[in-house]
Design a protein with these regions (language model features):
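Beta-strand-centric surfaces of beta-sandwich/beta-rich domains
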Residues: 1-202
Length: 202
């Protein structure tokens, strides 16, 4: 009965594979290009509690016909009335400029207001037009208006599960780099981090 969709994300980004079909497997997400002929099987194992009803809608904005099969599992759970609901949002920026040695640039990836919740993951796809490494920025999480971040990381590459600019795809239960074009870290890169064990409450 929500007035707006609680999940509003392009399909490839929701499944952690965008841009393109990039096979990988983590604890909660999987893309398998071998099972579906010319397409791909995309799997999400996120639990998505709802109280009265749920609706899944997929919009094809490509201009080309797409065949799709959707399978889901559900169960009655009396505890669902007390559970937090699942939300996912998508943000695109194509105007992020480098500071060319003039300091740092903080780029907000998510702002949340209105209600309690848990931050449980992030998927990041980017295009790097140069071979220079893009990921030295530290992730910072400010909770409930705090003046200094309660989470202050050591670098984007550390947040996504590797300690230097790895140019090869990889996947583990909670981290993945599903695409890295190269040479080096030039071109499209797609990363994801699941924070189910270290969720951030707000």
């Amino acid at each position: 009965d929500a007035a707006e969709p609680q999940v509003a994300v392009p399909l490839g980004d929701f499944f952690g594979t965008g841009p393109g079909v990039n096979p990988f497997r983590t604890l909660l997400q999987e893309v398998d290009a071998r099972k579906a002929g010319d397409g791909a099987e995309m799997v999400s194992r996120w639990e998505m509690p709802y109280r009265r009803n749920a609706r899944i809608a997929v919009a094809n904005q490509s201009g080309s016909p797409v065949d799709m099969v959707v399978r889901y599992q559900w169960r009655d759970d009396p505890a669902a009335a007390d559970m937090l609901t699942f939300h996912a949002r998508w943000l695109q920026r194509d105007d992020v400029q480098t500071v060319k040695g003039a300091g740092t640039l903080d780029w907000p990836a998510l702002r949340v207001s209105g209600g309690a919740g848990r931050f449980v993951g992030l998927q990041c796809s980017l295009y790097n037009p140069v071979t220079a490494w893009w990921g030295e920025g530290d992730e910072k999480v400010y909770v409930d208006g705090e003046p200094f971040p309660s989470t202050f990381g050591t670098g984007t590459e550390d947040y996504f599960g590797y300690a230097w600019g790895d140019p090869a795809p990889f996947a583990s239960p909670f981290h993945a780099q599903t695409r890295c074009d190269g040479p080096g870290t030039k071109g499209n890169t797609s990363l994801l981090r699941l924070q189910t064990l270290d969720a951030i409450p707000f």
